[in-house]
A protein has these predicted regions:
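Eukaryotic intrinsically disordered, low-complexity regulatory linkers and tails enriched in Ser/Thr/Pro
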Residues: 1-165
Length: 165
């Protein structure tokens, strides 16, 4: 049931990446584990259901020590915020790795206030295969005037890292 060396259950072995670098049993969602690899994070239930996210999909992760809760927000607003509650013995290595991996996936970022009054937020992100891509998020539906500023933001971000169109 468990790997001897680190007490990671065998059901956490990923067919693509092998055993996670670190993992921890969690209180909520019930009967689940959070596991992290250099390329991704997964919430895995004891029944074998997997919810996997590559690091570039994650906008931010924050730790509330009073609640013992890790809150993960995603770039895609359609993906519900993930709240992971730990028992009293939270895995500090796992928390550090989540933070470091999310930060590593963000190469650079910039913001621009748009003519419509909304804001565009852009960043160059890194996939697990080390390829780079642009993410642009806009706080409201862009107007025609906004589109020019958004294109300028994307161009500036690409120039920062030498990324072609």
């Amino acid at each position: 049931m468990f790997r001897k060396s680190s007490r990671i259950p065998t059901f956490l072995k990923n067919k693509h990446n092998g055993y996670p670098t670190t993992a921890s049993e969690i209180v909520e969602p019930q009967e689940s584990w959070i596991a992290v690899w250099p390329s991704e994070l997964a919430i895995v239930s004891n029944t074998g259901d997997w919810r996997v996210h590559e690091w570039f999909e994650i906008e931010a992760a924050s730790w509330d020590s009073a609640l013992r809760e890790l809150t993960i927000t995603f770039v895609d607003p359609a993906i519900e915020i993930l709240r992971v509650r730990f028992a009293a013995d939270a895995n500090e290595q796992l928390l550090t790795m989540v933070h470091e991996r999310v930060e590593r996936s963000i190469v650079c970022r910039n913001y621009v206030d748009l003519p419509s009054g909304s804001m565009a937020y852009g960043q160059i992100r890194r996939r697990a295969d080390e390829s780079l891509f642009v993410q642009i998020l806009v706080s409201a539906q862009p107007t025609q005037a906004d589109v020019k500023e958004i294109a300028k933001l994307e161009s500036e971000l690409r120039d920062m890292v030498g990324l072609d169109f």
